[in-house]
Design a protein with these regions (language model features):
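Forkhead-associated
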Residues: 1-52, 58-59, 107-176
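Short amphipathic alpha-helical linker/capping segments at the junctions of internal repeats
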Residues: 47, 55, 72-76
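Regulatory inter-domain linker segments that are low-complexity and enriched
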Residues: 61-130, 139-143, 177-184
Length: 184
């Protein structure tokens, strides 16, 4: 964190005063988010289950997955239908979270998969130097959501909800700090 911590980053404004805690339990290293504002993110390898509402990082982009609510498009009491843009199909939307807490773009998925990267994907960030051409893939089967890193150079990071067991070589991202786990 920023204040009175064994691992101290006093100049990182994106860290909470006490951001995270690293400790051993049953001879395994664990990281715990201590209620930080911006979260603790762990690099994923391969495919992981992704709960709805989870936040993840690709490059400098913080993205969140939401389930699109079913809306009754029927007429109101007097028989009038609400006129607006037509709805896209799909059950999911990806929401970009901006610094300061604002919402950036929202992408309504048309199908069961979404690819994220720099170019040639469903969602592209051509100006983000930390995103690979084809960086990550989301898949939804109607009941389960998965996130897969596609061998990106800088990794895909999933926000932990409470604690996560770490192994040698794992990466943890918090604030502006990228930490590599070295268990000796």
């Amino acid at each position: 964190g920023r204040v009175d911590c064994p691992i101290l980053f006093p100049d990182d404004p994106f860290l909470s005063p006490v951001h995270a805690n690293f400790f051993y339990r049953d001879q395994k290293l664990v990281v715990r988010d201590e209620g930080s504002v911006n979260g603790v993110f762990a690099r994923i390898t391969g495919q992981v289950d992704l709960p709805l509402g989870a936040r993840f990082l690709v490059g400098e982009q913080m993205l969140e997955v939401e389930l699109v609510a079913t809306i009754d498009e029927g007429a109101v009491e007097d028989g009038t239908y609400y006129f607006a843009s037509p709805r896209r199909g799909g059950d999911l939307r990806i929401v970009q979270r901006l610094r300061g807490g604002d919402t950036g773009f929202t992408y309504g998925a048309l199908g069961a998969t979404i690819r994220v990267g720099r170019e040639g994907n469903d969602i592209d960030f051509p100006d983000d130097p930390f995103i690979s051409g084809h960086h990550a893939h989301l898949a939804w089967d109607g009941a389960h959501l998965t996130l897969t890193d596609l061998g990106s150079k800088n990794g895909t990071f999933l926000r932990i909800t409470h604690e996560r067991t770490l192994v040698h070589g794992d990466y943890v991202f918090m604030g502006q700090q990228l930490l590599r786990v070295e268990i000796v």
